[in-house]
Regions:
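Sec-dependent N-terminal signal peptides of Gram-positive bacterial secreted proteins and lipoproteins
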Residues: 1-27
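Zinc-dependent metalloendopeptidases
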Residues: 25-145
Length: 145
């Protein structure tokens, strides 16, 4: 009887360890998005009506321990962030531009649109969280289903 208990305890302990390690590995993974930029350095034009939301979001990304480098540049011809009133329920929308192939592949530029219709009553922190999220798509991070 004691031998059976020992075997059962060993099996249960093994299962607990296996489950613990597999959960930790899963938690560290991310979902890859193939419409992200070809480079981790990007020139972005700020067209937002609230420039502090943009500055804080860019600062948050640039201060991470990643190779991301977002440079703010004036003028057209670059990726840009803009807000407007859109007749839809989304908060933010990332659109890749100049893709490697006709309809797929990594992007050369992007547009991020923030929907004032949905965000009008939200705090600056909420706006910033939406922009930080959308900028994540530029660096190949997909939505978590």
């Amino acid at each position: 009887m004691r031998e059976k208990t020992k075997k059962l305890s060993s099996i249960l302990l093994c299962l607990v360890f296996c489950f613990s390690f597999s959960t930790a590995v899963y938690a560290a993974s991310y979902i890859y998005y193939d419409g992200g930029l070809k480079s981790a350095t990007v020139d972005v034009e700020n067209r937002l009506s609230n420039s502090s939301v943009y500055k804080n979001s860019v600062s948050a990304w640039n201060s991470t321990n990643t190779p991301v480098n977002i440079k703010t540049v004036p003028g057209s011809g670059h990726s840009y962030v803009i807000d407007g009133v859109y007749n839809d329920t989304w908060y933010g929308l990332y659109t890749p531009k100049n893709r490697q192939w006709i309809i797929s592949g990594r992007a050369g530029k992007f547009t991020i649109e923030l929907n004032r219709k949905e965000l009008v009553s939200e705090s600056d922190n909420f706006w910033q969280s939406v922009l930080v999220h959308e900028l994540g798509h530029a660096f190949c991070l997909d939505d978590n289903p």
